Amino acid sequence: MSTAEDILYQAYNEGIRAEVFIEVQNLRKEDPKKYKYKEFADIIEEAYNNVKGRENKKDE
């Protein structure tokens, strides 16, 4: 399994898969040059971490 797959399975189990995909779209829209040549798994991981970070802040 690839890293992207593992992250997406984890996001699915946590119920945040849709939010991760939305965050991926937002990241690519914000800075297309930065994410143009970046590995998809790295973008997924960054999006997952962003969503988890927001979720943790909301819980505090």
Each language-model region and where it sits:
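C-terminal alpha-helical interaction appendages
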Residues: 1-60
